[in-house]
Amino acid sequence: TKSTTTACCDFCPCTRSIPPQCQCTDVREKCHSACKSCLCTRSFPPQCRCYDITDFCYPSCS
């Protein structure tokens, strides 16, 4: 598994529009470094998800 310093995503659904709208739906202890809109739960360990919408998917983390 890659670290969160490298932007990566295992689950990234995209719309069929042109350009596509993609969103990483991975839930991790923190968001990857390229994430601009990261929301985390207050649980321990935290569960974080990046809510950015891009026109591409990052490489797989695993």
From Swiss-Prot:
Site feature: Reactive bond for trypsin: 16-17, 42-43
Task: Please give the positions of the paired cysteines in each disulfide bond.
Answer: 8-61, 9-24, 12-57, 14-22, 31-38, 35-50, 40-48
One GO term describing the cellular component:
extracellular region
Checking Pfam families in the record gives: Bowman-Birk_leg (PF00228)
Any one Gene Ontology molecular-function term assigned to this protein's record: serine-type endopeptidase inhibitor activity
Q: Which UniProt keywords apply?
A: Disulfide bond, Protease inhibitor, Serine protease inhibitor
| Regions that span the bilayer | none
Q: Which domain of life is it from?
A: Eukaryota
Primary role: Inhibits trypsin but not chymotrypsin. Inhibits the trypsin-like proteinase activity present in larvae of the crop pests Adoxophyes orana, Hyphantria cunea, Lobesia botrana and Ostrinia nubilalis.
Q: How does it assemble?
A: Forms a monomer at protein concentrations of below 1 mM. At concentrations of above 2 mM, self-associates.
Q: Which family does it belong to?
A: Belongs to the Bowman-Birk serine protease inhibitor family.
Which protein is depicted?
Bowman-Birk type proteinase inhibitor
> What species does this protein belong to?
Medicago scutellata (Snail medic)
Q: What is the lineage of its organism?
A: Eukaryota, Viridiplantae, Streptophyta, Embryophyta, Tracheophyta
